[in-house]
Amino acid sequence: MGENKTGDGGKLLYCSFCGKSQHEVRKLIAGPSVYVCDECVELCNDIIREEIKEISPKRDQDKLPTPHELRAHLDDYVIGQEKAKKVLSVAVYNHYKRLRNAGPKDGVELGKSNILLIGPTGSGKTLLAETLARFLNVPFTMADATTLTEAGYVGEDVENIIQKLLQKCDYDVEKAQRGIVYIDEIDKISRKSDNPSITRDVSGEGVQQALLKLIEGTVAAVPPQGGRKHPQQEFLQVDTSKILFICGGAFAGLEKVIEQRTHTGSGIGFGAQVKGKEEKESMSDILSQVEPEDLVKYGLIPEFIGRLPVVATLAELDEDALIQILSEPKNALTKQYAALFEMENVELEFREDALKAIAQKAMSRKTGARGLRSIVEGILLDTMYDLPSQQGVSKAVVDESVVKGESAPILIYEQTESQAASGDQ
């Protein structure tokens, strides 16, 4: 085949597919008595790409990753939280195994196991859910429980969560029904008191009631393409029993509720057993003893807790874990910034004392891993501002003094030809 813009004897040529002349298109490719224009070639490419997109998820479904494989993938991106990784891997594996073997098995219908993650801010709750969804190649969306209200009140309806999930997969209902929904700040919709109130709690217990059916499994009616609901509109029917819901929250103060129940090292009077400082349990140890009754006392209604049978607790990250997070995962912060500097042909080096100082700063802010990026961004801001305008920089080094704000990153310049000839360093 060869390009042909003029026919034999000056004859005008046309595309054999769309009929456009050689003057209406940029390129006309000639074959044996056949011509095809660049627009038709591009259209054919688009059709092939669409078909590949449709086939690839089906191929991914052929083999469901085992809990060991899921855990290994989480290890690449999430540091620590070993118990939570194991619990999540098994729960996610069982959920998708249930979907693949739909229908009762020997008269036994498999129940749905949604997940509740309990852990402090910046401990990796969102990252765990997001990493699993990416690995399984399923749609994933996040919702903030604090923005949800009961239907009829100002705020987001719970159905909006399904709307967001549909948007992630171009309103493909089948894809959405295999998705994962992460609802953050679930502890913020706890009941305001232990006793049911006569006043309406539209952002607390009311939202829990509204989420019940959605999480357990119902057919949600969602308007197509984000349109507002009105009687003439056809709704998309989404079966939420196939969607995996993961709820997460910090549950500040829950450890006190657990301690009251366990009565370890508490009490008053001469006969009370009081633990010394070295004997006191860490918060993660206390949270790992959580029972449904503790969550009820905290403010979640029993029916809601019943829809989240799998509970995993995450430990607060210590200094060593934060140092690992900075440098070890596949998408570690230091690797991300090194890649940014590499685009300017500059090598970026973080020294060990710098990593330790960054981790200590994050610990003092009590923001967990979430605070690491803002610290690193602040350290490198001036350097990233000046670097594109500077010539000959080959390396930037960050040490402890840079993190403490005592000095700027050390810039190492390339040796020029004239310096090399004169022997200057």
UniProtKB/Swiss-Prot annotation:
Species per Swiss-Prot/TrEMBL record: Shewanella amazonensis (strain ATCC BAA-1098 / SB2B)
Keyword Methyltransferase annotated: no
GO CC annotation: HslUV protease complex
Organism ancestry: Bacteria, Pseudomonadati, Pseudomonadota, Gammaproteobacteria, Alteromonadales
Binding-site residues for Zn(2+), renumbered to this chain: 15, 18, 37, 40
Pfam families the UniProt entry points to: AAA_2 (PF07724), ClpB_D2-small (PF10431), zf-C4_ClpX (PF06689)
Function: ATP-dependent specificity component of the Clp protease. It directs the protease to specific substrates. Can perform chaperone functions in the absence of ClpP.
Similarity comment: Belongs to the ClpX chaperone family.
GO-annotated molecular function: ATP binding; ATP hydrolysis activity; ATP-dependent protein folding chaperone; protein dimerization activity; unfolded protein binding; zinc ion binding
One GO process term, biological-process aspect: proteolysis involved in protein catabolic process
Subunit structure: Component of the ClpX-ClpP complex. Forms a hexameric ring that, in the presence of ATP, binds to fourteen ClpP subunits assembled into a disk-like structure with a central cavity, resembling the structure of eukaryotic proteasomes.
Binding site for ATP: 120-127
All copies of domain ClpX-type ZB, residue ranges: 3-56
Keyword set, alphabetical order: ATP-binding, Chaperone, Metal-binding, Nucleotide-binding, Zinc
Origin: domain of life: Bacteria
CDD domains registered for this protein in UniProt: RecA-like_ClpX
Protein's UniProt name: ATP-dependent Clp protease ATP-binding subunit ClpX
